[in-house]
């Protein structure tokens, strides 16, 4: 999965849920905050599907269980 597509999917889900979305750059990763949850995603062109799912799972407390499916 393209990293930009993963971030876009998270941003759209946050907007749909009425939660604040923030994207910020760190040294080698992009930080993402949805509501009160923070996570990072590597700054690569591609993010492996398994890694993207782990990132999505980290945000399910805010966005709801299985929101990415």
Region roles according to the model:
Residues 1-26, 33-69:
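Basic nucleic-acid-binding interfaces
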């Amino acid at each position: 999965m393209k990293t930009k597509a993963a971030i876009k999917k998270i941003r759209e889900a946050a907007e749909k849920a009425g939660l604040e979305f923030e994207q910020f750059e760190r040294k080698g990763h992009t930080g993402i905050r949805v509501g009160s949850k923070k996570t990072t995603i590597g700054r690569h062109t591609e993010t492996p599907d398994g890694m993207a799912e782990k990132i999505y799972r980290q945000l399910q407390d805010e966005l709801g269980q299985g929101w990415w499916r």
